[in-house]
């Protein structure tokens, strides 16, 4: 692989990593009915809208959390989002679980390759469990303070 191909591969992987943070569970919901949304009020949220930074911090109409409403958080330019989905299909998205796990499965239409993108820890108060789990995994302990090797010896 030459330098140009290697740089392209790194760019593709960085884009996939960024896209994995998209709130794809919001597809099909509607933008809040608010005039600040400039013609998008009460319209359906599309795949492209999720990643498009134009709609960053736009709130949905049917969010379920009063304190922390559902909002879009895209970081792609409109052109970048369009090109991304011309190249990749979103196959499956697992939104954050209680433990903080989230992953997205993409398919590259050109290379016919699959990519499983697993998101990292998000630092939100309601997801403190995720940080605690990461800590225990990092020190090789379970929640009771017993190391994995001690538990293994007890069997």
Model regions: which residues?
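A conserved cap/lid and substrate-binding interface adjacent to the catalytic center
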Residues: 35, 45, 49-155
């Amino acid at each position: 692989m030459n330098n140009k191909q290697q740089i392209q591969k790194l760019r593709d992987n960085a884009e996939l990593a960024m896209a994995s943070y998209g709130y794809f569970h919001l597809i099909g919901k509607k933008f809040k009915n608010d005039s600040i949304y400039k013609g998008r009020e009460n319209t359906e949220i599309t795949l492209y809208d999720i990643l498009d930074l134009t709609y960053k911090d736009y709130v949905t109409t049917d969010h379920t959390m009063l304190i922390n409403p559902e909002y879009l958080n895209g970081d792609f330019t409109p052109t970048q989002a369009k090109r991304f989905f011309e190249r990749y299909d979103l196959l499956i998205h697992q939104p954050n679980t209680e433990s903080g796990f989230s992953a997205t499965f993409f398919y590259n239409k050109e290379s016919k390759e699959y990519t499983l993108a697993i998101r990292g820890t998000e630092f939100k108060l309601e997801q403190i469990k995720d940080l605690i789990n990461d800590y225990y995994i990092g020190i090789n302990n379970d929640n009771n303070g017993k190391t994995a090797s001690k538990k293994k010896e007890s069997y």
